[in-house]
Amino acid sequence: TRTDSSAASDVYKRQQLPYPLMNIINGGAHANNGLRIQEFMIRPDRAKSFSEAMRICFVVIKNLSKLIKDKGLSTSVGDEGGFAPMISSNNQALDLIVSAIKKSGFVNGKDVSICLDVAANELYKKNKYSIHSKSYISVDKSIKEYQKIIKKYKIKSIEDPFAENDWLAWNKLMKSIKKVQIVGDDLYVTNLERLKKGFLNISSNSILIKLNQIGTVSETLDVIKFAQTIGYKTIISHRSGDSEDTFIADLAVGTNSNQIKTGSLARSERVAKYNQLIRIEEELGKKARMNKIN
């Protein structure tokens, strides 16, 4: 879809495929288990093609399913297609994912990276957070807990680590950790003015793009263009309640966005986007390239 927006001036010239941020374990508001973090995802960082990225994710998911079953837990899925086992510890979920990556023959943090969507709005009360357990702790203590899991599990991306209006907490986190993708979703809601404020505040280094948050394609393109101009990574995203429409797959390629977040390899409304990206890659043929992560 082309538009006359100034933001669209050259974004269509590139032909690069986004890396998938694939949901593999659901928690928070997307599942009925006790996990505090809403989404546990993987990103196949060394995939040379989108088709290979899908194969890598499939193998990890298959082995994760076996590991969950071996523990006597259910492999039923949550809203976004990831498994929703009845476990209550973030570390338990992360341990399972690390084991699945290793069992698949990949190296965690190199071949495949773990990424999180904390959705901290749901875990915020009176300037404190219950991200890592049911107990509410201060921002500074929460940052220390983030530092621990980043080091232990080689986490490469964290979305919405703090509440949407806790600007100081976001800035503190950005100053405290390096080489981690800090993604604003609720922080920005695909709104150009909030993105400009976040940039001045040094709140994040990446933005999640949801087309229907801002309402029009033109406004969405303006946000993407500005984000890319200031050096932010752009991640095109589905919604937790979605349809089989595949437009965001085309949007991700057309705007040269680094990554796409569209659920797991389950549920037709999620898989449809991945299938469209495979079709795009096939159509591009030898011109097809994967985007850059770093």
What are these model-predicted stretches?
Residues 10-13, 25, 46, 188, ...:
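Acidic, glycine-rich active-site loops and adjacent beta-strand->loop/helix elements
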Residues 39-50, 74-90, 119-133:
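Active-site-proximal beta-alpha loop/turn segments in soluble metabolic enzymes
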Residues 91-294:
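Catalytic core of soluble alpha/beta enzymes
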Residues 9-10, 54, 82:
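Metal- or metallocofactor-binding catalytic centers and their adjacent structured scaffolds
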Residues 64-68, 72, 82-84, 93, ...:
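Gly/Ser/Thr-enriched, mixed-charge loops and adjacent short helices
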Residues 19-35, 79-83, 118, 244-247, ...:
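Conserved phosphate/anionic-ligand binding catalytic regions in large, soluble enzymes, centered on
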Residues 1-8, 12:
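Single conserved hydrophobic/aromatic residue that forms the stacking wall/gate
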Residues 15-78:
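Mobile "lid/hinge" segments at catalytic clefts and subdomain interfaces of large enzymes
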